């Protein structure tokens, strides 16, 4: 018995490992794995079902077919364990060795491994410096290659066709050696001397000038170094021995009727063995060359098919025309090993069922059907029954459970008590898709779900199903209770707002309760307490909505936490007073003394959580729900057709619009407006008519006139059911009501353009056939969109998770002083996001000062919570530099200070929190709510009249940002700089509005002047671009010759003549080289200078500029010398929604990106070509000029002689993220991506914290390009992880050597995922073959740092509770590696120490 136990113990060995290395297998290694050579293609004997000897299933090689029994049956049972039968040669052992013992095939001729040949870039090709086509021609026996040129004129590696080879043979005899096939390639690879080649290439690298050649050499050098450092030999890319997979991993199963089901691999192996054996025989017979060659080629092809079928040529198909599944197909794709079995598995102790509402449950409970519970908790029940002595054996217990004896149910109740179960609803888009609940046993077969968690699960009760999982071990139960319990997940990890806010019925009920009604029964009564109100309501003396005065008692919690009671009399309603009963102590009555819509309820819960903590909030949320359901029932709100009141004005409004349209039509027919204008105007008319109708309808619905107590008519909010549902936020919106009771309005065609005849009817009136037909477009498109959207959104989430999965918080503080500058987000005139929302929960990077003083308000490293944000607002701070993960200095992770608050918990983030995955889920989860389409701008949107002024919305003072200006004769400011911005500051110094103002804007107010709301403070001409003079004087035309470089045109209406400069293309040969310009001269005729510089005041005139002045005219400062007509920018389709987010994260280049200035300096134009202009920037310090060719049709914002800063926009267009990073740095690119992504989500009303987007950006920026290598071993132009360069640089600096310099690089998320350090993670994402090939050649080892790698190798993930486990393990390992220091101590010292100790012990007695 002891032996048996010892034996079983020895089988389960889990080796401690902390990395996985992948490499090339040498022929000897393959032979060492093998337990014997497979020589025959036979599998099993069809009569006896016994494996054939030396075949693919041979028992002698791979092990016995039955446990502890040899094939011939001579030795059976455990006592013969380890004996090798002398008759059949089979070892007596367990069958499961057939899963791990490999065999091998000795190939008669070497064969190239297709992965290293065909996976691009071809590794064999790179190694030999030959093209893939050449190598293939050698391998597949089409031409010879010279291996040893000897003394001849041939070169090593030269290709020879059959004829050339015969010629060479005649000429040189056996002076040289040339071969074909894999042997030739093998010999070439074997002949490479890696060290010599590497040295040679490193020497020649600096002297190479051509970019392409340099890239190629660098690539080859890196490959050689990879081989050299990893200890792989290049010739191992050619196989001489082929390993054979253990037979139980490619099973052969007999079906009934004498047929067999088999794995495709067996077919592929059989093919290889057949051809190999035939080749051996041909070689023994010394067959003619051509036959042998053909056989070798066929062998090569069959091995190719086994390793990666279909990679080269046509895929080999089986009997049913289906391509056979090769070894490579086993691991790649969604059905491959990685994604199917390693990253997600099916689990036991789970069940699924339909869900129904559980309105009586508490928040931490779920209803579990008894039948399911009995099945799920079976082992626990058996154990309890046995422990109780109710059943003697497990078998008896099983019988009892099957009979469902009464005791079983009692036991089940006990087992289930406080044993949480996990509920999951697919698709699990974020971590709230799996939560833990305590089960409550219920009758029936459906799981009951608490209504408040529906929002987190995105569940409804129209047939949704959910899965139940039982955590078995004590640790699992503990984690489920402490971390996953629904009561612990009140705040959303995406934005820190409560996620368990009531919706629908509950909102309607609470809203109904809190409404007031004029002259209700009991209006004007006084109550001494809320209890009295309840009595009055119950007896019917006062109705729910009556306006009354009540004395309420509130508990106020002071700053130090002491509670005091306050009494006051408030004007309120009966319903609100009743609501105050469920309000937890410490919240003010004012929170419920208002109409309780969805927003107000959400705010109420948020306040409760922040002020009173978790427990009170959970209890309160439940109470709110019960109350809401109760009063929703009492209210009897329902939807009837009469609730959809059609406004009387509708018909006149529609008639007016139709008349206007007729008028436009007549104008069009008489030729006064173009077809495009007519279309746009018609659409505008209908759009505004629709607005008017819906406004009239809402006014009609939302108010009703009643008689108050004094008998006077008064308006009050209506109690119309439909209006109440929309107003409270329970269901529906103004837009939907408009379709029910207003008019449906304009519809779009499938291509996105708007149909100009609107649907005037609404759903109450009903649609006619034509109207219905027009409507179907949109409805169908919506359905098709939804299906696409789900798939696309899922794919985006997958890419995001993949790129961010290894980001975990690993230390408290990295100590960086860097950070991002946060300002309130202002678009046009509105504050879209105030500063407090952007910095809440972040850590300050640089001390925040009291405005205008040197005193510190918030010191560095303060975590800004609600109280701090109030302080910042009090002192009207409008800019804070906060820590960000983008600037965090931690290697392989981030620090808690740079991340800030854990949004779902409300305190500083813990170590081991998987912030990468949380960020990916937070961005991906709302993806399904985004739209899919690109907006075509047509009709109303496109013609939004070009802006030409700024009208302010708030009073305050005027402030200019990066603006240069001159003052003209009227005392007004004229802007003479690009990208200037104008802001309105309130009296506290907070920025309220911000506008971009173009060059040439005239400001009505001076800087710092006060402005009133509604003032127009800036004007400009949107259609022309002026050239403004900065000095006064008289003008002198240079190179302006009539008919050569300009023409005069006279305006027919005004009779004024103006000069128009000709474009270079329109000028004759004489004018090609001329540069028309206006020079300013003083009274004495000398050239004037631009103030403060040595630059003469002269202004070049580009083509098509219009000059309205005459030669020698006098002008003043700020006057326009010339005007350049601006073509209206082409209307671009705005990519919106999901595709836009994907484009941003993939860092895709836009079609016609904005052109940015590469360096700071002065603009000039060089020689033009046919379609392009040459833009030259000359730096002020006299450095090297920068030239760029720009297509002529691009609209440039700059003129000759103008100064630009690096990164300024030269030609308009969408900006490319790569350019922003290169020219404006990391902070700007981060701001750009964050704001652009937020814009898309904000449009859909989705709130996501900036942090999450920053986390993804950090991952996109984790690679850099080495600009100079210094003393490091990096290569120039190599792409490396930033953290690796930083670590290497620290070491170099310590040794006093030159560190490497680098430039950050922005990678799209797909590229960044594939470029991770971990090859396991990259291989399980996409392009498995390429990733594995690359990793094998470089002998890479994976340190299992990320989450995905650990899931794949089956360990705990290094995040959350697993983080602690990994930390202790690593610490233990580090301790083990430390040398043990033995303190040498003399005997007398030891004696003395002992004596001291004894004395000490004695004195303590």
UniProtKB/Swiss-Prot annotation:
Residues that, per the record, bind Zn(2+) 1: 70, 72, 85, 88
Binding annotation for Zn(2+) 2: 814, 888, 895, 898
SMART domains referenced in this protein's UniProt entry, alphabetically: RPOLA_N
Cellular-component GO terms for this entry: DNA-directed RNA polymerase complex
Family: Belongs to the RNA polymerase beta' chain family.
Function: DNA-dependent RNA polymerase catalyzes the transcription of DNA into RNA using the four ribonucleoside triphosphates as substrates.
Name of the protein in question: DNA-directed RNA polymerase subunit beta'
């Amino acid at each position: 018995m002891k032996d048996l136990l010892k034996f079983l113990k020895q089988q389960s060995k889990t080796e401690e490992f902390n990395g996985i290395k992948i490499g090339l297998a040498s022929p000897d290694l393959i032979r060492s794995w093998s337990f014997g050579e497979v020589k025959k293609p036979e599998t099993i004997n069809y009569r006896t079902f016994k494996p054939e000897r030396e075949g693919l299933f041979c028992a002698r090689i791979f092990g016995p077919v039955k446990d502890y029994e040899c094939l011939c049956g001579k030795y059976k049972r455990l006592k013969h364990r380890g004996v090798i039968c002398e008759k059949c040669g089979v070892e007596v052992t367990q069958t499961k060795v057939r899963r791990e013992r490999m065999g091998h095939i000795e190939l008669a001729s070497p064969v190239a491994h297709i992965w290293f040949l065909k996976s691009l870039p071809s590794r064999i090709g790179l190694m030999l410096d030959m093209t893939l086509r050449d190598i293939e021609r050698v391998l597949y026996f089409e031409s010879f290659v010279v291996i040893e040129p000897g003394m001849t004129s041939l070169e090593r590696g030269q290709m020879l066709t059959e004829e050339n080879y015969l010629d060479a043979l005649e000429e040189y005899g056996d002076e040289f050696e040339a071969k074909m096939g894999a042997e030739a390639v093998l010999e070439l690879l074997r002949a490479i001397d890696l060290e010599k080649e590497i040295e040679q290439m490193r020497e020649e690298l600096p002297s190479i000038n051509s970019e392409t050649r340099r890239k190629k050499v660098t690539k080859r050098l890196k490959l050689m170094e990879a081989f050299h450092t990893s200890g792989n030999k290049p010739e191992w890319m050619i196989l001489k021995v082929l390993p054979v997979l253990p037979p139980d991993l490619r099973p052969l199963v007999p079906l009934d009727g004498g047929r067999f089901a088999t794995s495709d691999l067996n077919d592929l192996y059989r093919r290889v063995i057949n051809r190999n054996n035939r080749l051996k025989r041909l070689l023994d017979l010394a067959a003619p060359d051509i036959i042998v060659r053909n056989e070798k080629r066929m062998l090569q092809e069959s091995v190719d098919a086994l390793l990666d079928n279909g990679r080269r040529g046509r895929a080999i198909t089986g009997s049913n025309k289906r391509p056979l599944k090769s070894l490579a197909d086993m691991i790649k794709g969604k059905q491959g090993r990685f994604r199917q079995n390693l990253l997600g598995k099916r689990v036991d102790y789970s069940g699924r069922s339909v869900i129904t509402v559980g309105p009586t449950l508490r928040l931490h409970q779920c209803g579990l059907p008894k039948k399911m519970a009995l099945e799920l908790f079976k082992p626990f029940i058996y154990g309890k029954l046995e422990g109780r002595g109710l059943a003697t054996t497990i078998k008896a217990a099983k019988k009892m459970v099957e009979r469902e004896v009464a005791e079983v149910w009692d036991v089940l109740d006990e087992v289930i008590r406080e044993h949480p179960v996990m509920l999951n609803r697919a698709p699990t888009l974020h971590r709230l898709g799996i939560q833990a609940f305590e089960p409550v046993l219920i009758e029936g077969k459906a799981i009951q779900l608490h209504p408040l968690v529906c929002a987190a699960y995105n569940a409804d009760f129209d047939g949704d199903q959910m899965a139940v999982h039982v955590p078995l071990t004590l640790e699992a139960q503990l984690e489920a209770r402490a971390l996953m319990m629904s009561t612990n997940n009140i705040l959303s990890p995406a934005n820190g707002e409560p996620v368990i806010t009531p919706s629908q019925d509950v909102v309607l009920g609470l809203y109904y309760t809190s409404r007031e009604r004029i002259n209700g029964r009991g209006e004007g009564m006084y109550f001494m307490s809320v209890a009295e109100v309840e009595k009055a309501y119950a007896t019917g003396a006062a109705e729910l909505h009556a306006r009354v005065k009540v004395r309420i008692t509130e508990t106020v919690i002071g700053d130090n936490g002491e509670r005091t009671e306050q009494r006051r009399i408030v004007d309120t309603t009966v319903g609100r007073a009743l609501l105050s009963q469920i309000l937890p102590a410490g919240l003010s009555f004012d929170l419920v003394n208002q109409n309780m819509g969805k927003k107000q309820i959400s705010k109420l819960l948020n306040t409760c959580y922040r002020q009173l903590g978790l427990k009170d909030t959970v209890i309160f949320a439940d109470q709110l729900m019960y109350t809401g359901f109760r009063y929703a029932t009492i209210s009897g709100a329902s939807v009837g057709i009469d609730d959809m009141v059609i406004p009387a004005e509708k018909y006149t409004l529609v008639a007016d619009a139709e008349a206007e349209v007729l008028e436009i039509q007549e104008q069009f027919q008489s030729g006064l407006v173009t077809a495009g204008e007519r279309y746009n105007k018609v659409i505008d008319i209908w759009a505004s008519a629709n607005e008017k109708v819906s406004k009239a309808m809402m006014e009609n619905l939302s108010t009703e006139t009643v008689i108050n107590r004094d008998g006077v008519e008064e308006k009050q909010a209506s109690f119309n059911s439909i209006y109440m549902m929309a107003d409270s936020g329970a269901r529906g919106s103004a837009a939907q009501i408009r379709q029910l009771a207003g008019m449906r309005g304009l519809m779009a065609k499938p291509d996105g353009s708007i149909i100009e005849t609107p649907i005037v009817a609404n759903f109450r009136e009903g649609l006619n056939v034509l109207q219905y037909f027009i409507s179907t477009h949109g409805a169908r498109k919506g359905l098709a969109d939804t299906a696409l959207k789900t798939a696309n959104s899922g794919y985006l989430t997958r890419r995001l998770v993949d790129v961010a999965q290894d980001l975990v918080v690993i230390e408290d503080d990295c100590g960086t002083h860097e950070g991002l500058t946060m300002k309130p987000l202002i678009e046009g005139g509105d504050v879209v996001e105030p500063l407090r929302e952007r910095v809440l929960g972040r850590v300050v990077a640089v001390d925040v000062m009291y405005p205008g003083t040197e005193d510190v308000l918030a010191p560095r490293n303060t975590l800004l919570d609600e109280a701090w944000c109030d302080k910042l607002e009090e002192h009207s701070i409008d800019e804070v530099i906060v820590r960000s993960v983008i600037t965090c200095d931690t290697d392989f992770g981030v620090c808690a200070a740079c991340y800030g608050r854990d949004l779902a918990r409300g305190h500083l983030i813990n170590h081991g929190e998987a912030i990468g995955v949380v960020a990916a889920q937070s961005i991906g989860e709302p993806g399904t709510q985004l739209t899919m389409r690109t907006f075509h701008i047509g009709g109303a949107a496109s013609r939004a009249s070009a802006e030409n002024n700024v009208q302010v919305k708030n009073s305050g003072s005027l402030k200019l940002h990066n603006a240069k200006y001159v003052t003209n004769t009227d005392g007004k400011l004229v802007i003479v700089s690009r990208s200037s911005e104008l802001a309105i500051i309130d009296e506290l110094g907070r920025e309220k509005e911000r506008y971009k103002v173009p060059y040439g804007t005239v400001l009505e107010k001076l800087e710092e002047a006060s402005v009133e709301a509604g003032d127009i403070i800036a004007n400009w001409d949107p259609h022309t671009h002026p050239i403004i003079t900065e000095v006064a004087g008289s003008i002198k035309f240079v190179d302006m010759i009539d008919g050569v470089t300009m023409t005069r045109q006279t305006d027919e209406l005004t009779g004024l003549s103006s000069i128009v400069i000709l474009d270079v293309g329109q000028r004759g040969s004489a004018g090609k080289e001329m540069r028309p310009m206006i020079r300013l001269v003083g009274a004495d005729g000398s050239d004037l200078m631009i103030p403060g510089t040595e630059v003469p005041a002269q202004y070049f005139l580009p083509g098509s500029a219009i000059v309205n002045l005459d030669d020698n005219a006098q002008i003043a400062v700020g006057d326009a010398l010339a005007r350049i007509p601006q073509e209206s920018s082409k209307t671009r389709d705005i990519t919106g929604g999901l595709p836009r987010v994907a484009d941003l994260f993939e860092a895709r280049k836009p079609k016609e990106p904005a052109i940015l200035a590469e360096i700071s300096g002065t603009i000039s134009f060089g020689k033009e070509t046919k379609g392009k202009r040459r833009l030259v920037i000359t730096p002020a310090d006299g450095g090297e000029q920068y030239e760029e060719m720009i297509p002529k049709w691009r609209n440039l914002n700059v003129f000759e002689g103008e100064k630009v800063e690096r990164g300024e926009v030269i030609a308009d267009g969408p900006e490319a993220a790569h350019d922003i990073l290169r020219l404006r740095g990391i902070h700007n690119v981060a701001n750009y991506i964050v704001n652009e992504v937020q814009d898309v989500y904000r449009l859909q009303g989705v709130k996501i914290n900036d942090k999450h987007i920053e986390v993804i950006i950090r991952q996109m920026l984790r690679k850099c390009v080495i600009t100079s290598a210094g003393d490091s071993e990096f290569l120039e132009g190599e792409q490396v992880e930033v953290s690796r360069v930083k670590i290497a640089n620290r070491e170099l600096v310590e040794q006093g050597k030159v560190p490497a310099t680098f430039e950050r690089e922005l990678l799209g998320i797909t590229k960044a995922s594939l470029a991770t350090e971990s090859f396991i993670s990259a291989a399980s994402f996409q392009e498995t073959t390429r990733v594995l090939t690359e990793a094998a050649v470089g002998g890479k080892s994976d340190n299992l740092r990320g989450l995905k790698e650990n899931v794949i190798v089956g360990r705990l993930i290094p995040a959350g509770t697993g983080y602690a486990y990994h930390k202790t393990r690593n610490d233990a390992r580090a301790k083990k590696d430390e040398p043990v220091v033995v303190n040498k101590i003399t005997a007398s010292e030891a004696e003395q120490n002992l004596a001291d100790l004894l004395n000490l012990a004695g004195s303590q007695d």
